Amino acid sequence: METLSQDSLLECQICFNYYSPRRRPKLLDCKHTCCSVCLQQMRTSQKDVRCPWCRGITKLPPGFSVSQLPDDPEVLAVIAIPHTSEHTPVFIKLPSNGCYMLPLPISKERTLLPGDMGCRLLPGSQQKSLTVVTIPAEQQPLQGGAPQEAVEEEPDRRGVAKSSTWSGVCTVILVACVLVFLLGIVLHNMSCISKRFTVISCG
């Protein structure tokens, strides 16, 4: 398999969605990888799966589904898709240091508390841990109650949207008035030109 960046290793190169328990990384006979959802869509239109990159054919016997294709072990080692019976994964994107997905075990009986050491990023000797940091309540916009500043900003945002809509309407009306005025001038000039050639009797 060609060298890929960590981003492209973690996402299907057809639909650009991250691999997950629903979109498992499936390995084709040609050693290219794409998600099970994309492969299933390709399979519905043809009997065999044709690789979108090298056009290599992966033969699937009758009654054999895409989900029975092998998972790509390299991708699984990085993303560590858990079995759904073990725990519910939480995926955190950390762009500052290149770590993109971090499955944390969440127990229904016990929540992850500040200071708890959480989990795995890479297998084997490359395991890393995460210290959960407490964020002050006023800086937690995703909590059930929105911070007071966000509540105060909401009417301001609506006001900005209304004022920008109103200014757009006013601009259209102003342009229409200018066009009508110019049309009036042109029509007036045309009527004056036709009057120059009328015969005036002197009698």
UniProtKB/Swiss-Prot annotation:
Keywords: Apoptosis, Lysosome, Membrane, Metal-binding, Transferase, Transmembrane, Transmembrane helix, Ubl conjugation, Ubl conjugation pathway, Zinc, Zinc-finger
Gene: Rnf152
Region (Necessary for interaction with RRAGA): 106-165
EC number in record: 2.3.2.27
One annotated Gene Ontology cellular component of this protein: lysosomal membrane
Enzyme class per UniProt: transferase
Region feature Disordered, mapped onto this chain: 140-159
Metabolic or biological pathway, per its Swiss-Prot or TrEMBL entry: Protein modification; protein ubiquitination
Location (main, coarse): membrane
InterPro entries recorded: RING_RNF152, RNF152_C, Znf_RING, Znf_RING/FYVE/PHD
Family statement drawn from the similarity comment of this UniProt entry: Belongs to the RNF152 family.
Catalysed reaction equations from the record: S-ubiquitinyl-[E2 ubiquitin-conjugating enzyme]-L-cysteine + [acceptor protein]-L-lysine = [E2 ubiquitin-conjugating enzyme]-L-cysteine + N(6)-ubiquitinyl-[acceptor protein]-L-lysine
Zn finger spans (RING-type): 12-55
UniProt subunit comment: Interacts with RRAGA (inactive GDP-bound form); stimulated by amino acid starvation. Interacts with SEC16A.
This protein's name: E3 ubiquitin-protein ligase RNF152
